[in-house]
Amino acid sequence: MDHKSFLKTLNAKDKARLNARSDVRGLCHLMLYCAALGVTGSWIHFALPMWQIMLIPHGILIAFLFTLQHECTHNTPFRSLWLNSVAGHLIAFLLFQPFLWFRYFHLAHHKYTNIPGKDPELDGHEKPSSWGAFVRHLSTIDYWWAKITILIGNSVGPLTASYIPPRKRRSLRAEAVLLIVAYVVVFATAPTALLWLWIVPLILGFPVLRLYLLAEHGRCPEVEDMFLNTRTTLTTRIVQFLAWNMPYHAEHHAMPSVPFHKLPTLHKMTALHLGQVSDGYSKFSKAYVSSFWD
């Protein structure tokens, strides 16, 4: 059964139950997440024993805020639209990723998932197919270059990408300009501690996010069926928490309107129909790089 056939089996009551959003669930998850950031950040700030090692988990926590911003593009983490917007824009600053721009980019990705020439995630961003490309992918060099060019391009460029509605160009330009001004002010006035609490950890943590994201569509068929072009990865509760349940990624692509806390329920309903399932990220990674030896 493909994802469209599955959706036809759901009645109105099923859909309403799955699509029910909650400010309480979203805020509770966010508070726990911020508490974890507070612990790792305090450890670094007060230079507690082995604080240098703590830079890595702190950076992973910052980098994985990407998954919350990703959810905010769908307005699903919280019931209140303004909470999704505020969270999305705050994370935009931390990750150098404009929220409004990312929303249109990501919605196009959902519309044309894994279809070459249509999915913007595939435009100039081929999945690594050799050790050299894999190392470069994890180094995040391409990520940082892309974010710099997006910020500058959105602020002064023509904004001609097909996924950007013409009527939104002014908003995207204003967003990019405001972010650039904010970065100039912050980096000109912020204490050195900010470097160790934000930039250095983010650089160290981003490779983990890149490896995680590779599992979502890497080596999946270039077809329209979300149960085949997207991978669900069975993993630990810690990773599920860190990624806001996005390892249930095929389920998310089949029903993007389902909030993170309902994805485990949706997984139980779709498990028998999923065509791409990996038993953990380590197994996925080993299987992925094994082809490099051929």
Stretches with model-predicted labels:
Residues 255-257:
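Solvent-exposed interhelical
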Residues 158-163, 226-248:
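Active-site-proximal inter-transmembrane loops
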Residues 1-61, 68, 94-198, 261-294:
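Non-catalytic, topology-defining segments of multipass membrane proteins
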Residues 59-72, 98-101, 147, 198-224, ...:
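Transmembrane alpha-helical segments that form the membrane-embedded catalytic/substrate-channel core
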Residues 41-45, 69-74, 78, 107-110, ...:
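Membrane-water interface at transmembrane helix exits
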Residues 19, 77-96, 117-133, 224-239:
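Juxtamembrane helix-capping/reentrant segments at transmembrane boundaries
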